[in-house]
Amino acid sequence: MRFCFFFCFTASIFCTTGNSSDIVFCCAHTPCLLHLEVDQETSVTWIDSNTGQIPLCLSNGTCHISEKGLHFSANFSKDGLYIAIINETNYHAAEHYYLVYIYENCHQMPYDSPRHTGHKGTSFNWSMGLWLVKCSHNKTFFLPFVLDSAKSAPIIMTETAITIYISMIFLIVSLLTFLNVLITLNNKYKHYGV
């Protein structure tokens, strides 16, 4: 049995320690998209990091490439790291996507967001905020996210969002610690009748 919290934690560690920039969570047995829009003059090559070759799913028909990115069919549900090699005039880059599938009580919703245009037409439809992920056994977790506007609406966790999330946790813990110190001092002064 898989729990999305386990995946979120594992993928978060991978994202902050590895080379990945985006972590995409998708519901199993539903279509999924690694979203990367580029202009017609831009060349994009997708690579499976496990093999260093083009993804095997392209040859067996469980995924395909379009101007929107790398699409996975509902029949595909294998976690893995995929790299998009972007080649433009005087510009070369690599976008890393770690794909994680959630199997139980996973809910995806369509979402539309403003377009953010990157270098020379490379664009990403992203919107940052907090996303409520419902897991098995009625567990819920608020996670930092960047939502793709595709109908499959995968949850994408970026390094920036993870940093914000960790900062929020640190701030909350600091406030609780400060509050605890105030309560302790208050009780101490009451004990001595000050």
Swiss-Prot record:
Domain of life: Viruses
Glycosylation sites: N19, N60, N75, N87, N125, N138
Signal peptide: none
Protein keywords: Early protein, Glycoprotein
Cell membrane recorded as keyword: no
Keyword Nucleotide-binding annotated: no
Protein name: Early E3 22.1 kDa glycoprotein
Organism: Canine adenovirus serotype 1 (strain RI261) (CAdV-1)
